Amino acid sequence: MAPKAGKVVPVVAPADAGPPPNLDFIPHRIAVYERLKAAAAAELASKPRVPITVTLPDGRQLPGTAWQTTPYDLARSISKSLADRTVISRVNGVLWDLMRPLEGDADVALLDFEDDEAKRVYWHSSAHILGEAAEKAFGCHLCFGPPTDEGFFYDFGMPATDAHGQPNKHSAVTEDDQKRLSTLMDGIVRERQPFERLVMSKEDLLEMFRFNKYKQVLINSKIPDGTSTTVYRCGPLIDLCLGPHVVDTGRIKAFAVLKHSASYFLGDAKNDSLQRVYGISFPDKKLLSEYLRFLEEAAKKDHRRIGQDQELFFFHRMSPGSPFFLPHGMRIYNALKNFIVSEYHKRDYVEVMSPNMFNADLWRTSGHWQHYQEDMFTLEVEKQQWALKPMNCPGHCLIFGSRERSYRELPLRVAEFGVLHRNEASGALSGLTRVRRFVQDDSHIFCQEDQVGSEILAQFDFLETVYGALGMQFRLKLSTRPEQYLGHIDTWNRAEATLREALDTFAARTGSAWELNPGDGAFYGPKIDIQIMDALRRWHQCATVQLDFQLPQQFNLTYMAAEPPKAGEAKAASEAKAGETKTAAAANDAKAGDAEKKEDGETAAATTTQAAAAPPPGYARPVMVHRAVLGSFERFIATLSEHFAGKWPFWLSPRQILLVPVMADAEGYVREVQAALKARGFYVDSDLGANTMNKKIRTGQLLQYNFIFVLGAKEMQDRSVSIRVRDSKGDLTTLPLDEAVARLEKLRDEKALGTELVEAGKKA
């Protein structure tokens, strides 16, 4: 039996809320729902009630009745506590509402909030509660209300008029509105409104949502004629939704409305501007309190705040989304770049530079013009269309194809720190994490198919080296062939098998595990997504490894094979190529186009449906591997800023050493030490101002210098330095100058994360 709904809590608007919102669309929506719900209930009642067997994950089997027994009933039969803490069920591998009857024999798993999928269901249901509150507060028209990796949000359009038909002066959400929404949500939770599922035809959906232009667009664009989908109801809210959801709104025990912002319908600046409200929820108040404390800590470590406090970078309205890196920010940038360059040298990469701007014909060949043009900065030069490059891969194809290549040159690892531009919507810009102008540690590896496995393993080693130097963990996810794909299925199967083997080899060596993300590969090849975890235990997508069979074909890239072709081989190759293109629809599929708008995706959908001619006898087509370790320098620096909380390790620090004289007579020695340290390539400053020594030291601490050298008469006499370590309690360690320099060099060159410099020193 379903939990009973509690007493309805009336909505009382605050005295200063202004005219009431127009809620005329709600009775119409409910009337359509009630009519169809009655028909659905009658159909359910006619279903045959026959015995079924339910199998739990531990192998236990429970009896049930088809079209009557629900997962909630099963949980309740085991224990009330299990039923109370279960968020959602999984039936035969598919997420299933707890109150939805089983239709036959089934494998059933009961999932609580600790399960990642259940957590997203919990937050999705919380978003519906927020949507109901927003409708009550503003009479708004709801758009999207999805879960995210860190909670949920709802987008909605504010109404043009109020209940009296007057122009609506309340066009944007305010801080006071957040409090009001929270109060309304609290009432909805106390009402314990059941979540109800109903299947509806496209025609009925268009009638139900005829007052909501956003839902009309979604229904017409996403639901084919003659088909149906589902809506979910809680209280007066009925929303277009695939579900599933929790049992009732009372399951949301603790929540918070966090922030609000603006967004665009469908993410397009040409469409309506919407209001977006974010929230978070948990099954108990303790978890919520812990999360809110986490947010406070994260706010202190926000890279935008650190960038301002340490004078690393800034933004200006004259070029939104394009950061200005200041001298100290460039020190971090260059340290990272030099690190990558040194690894390139060890790993036989060749560095190139390609133009920033290309004729549109290049992008037509690659497919970007057809599927990525709106995200590119375009311009007209001498009556021809051009564009700033949003990625380097087509230019690298031109480099590979600039002369004849031999198998002896492969793998050819082409690297570039190219300046890229992507036309992000102004509302999507966010510090260094979402910008319009950025640089990647971008490389493309052209190799033979039998070299892919070793190249992937080499990338894992690259990741270990770089992330290990930064003290960051990473995890790997394999994304496999999507429904719509280009190329021959045998090629896909071989590629996925190669990636699996490489992942298994790496996992066995490191004692780690990798995750499978089925069907989420790019349409042009499988990929491995790499996420790193920062000090706040947040995961960030930075690195990527993607296989690409299509761009080499689009640009007709070939190399001389190792052996001359045998008789009949050329004909066989030609016949094989005839099956390369699965379908023209695959290339134009919206999913492929949408996927390539992600910042980490490189290649847009190829619209050429005719496969390039097979390579001539004696030649073969290379496989292309897109890879990056840092990804965007800008985003990676943002991640590192928050990971280290602005306390940079010595090798990466923009402020390594501060020299402070004890008295004026020591200033000459300060200059001598500064010159010696600068000659060895260190970033060293001196404070010869009029402030007291203690104030100079305090200033140096606030600016996060790794070491403060205090120099006085004794240090001059002994040619030594007294060293104060960042975050120390005031202890000084004395070392001879030459020894201090040697230890500094070791600390920098070994990319140590700690302060080993003074461990063997003598306490002053």
Spans of features found by a protein language model:
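NTP/phosphate- and nucleic-acid-binding module
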Residues: M1-C143, P147-D149, D155-A764
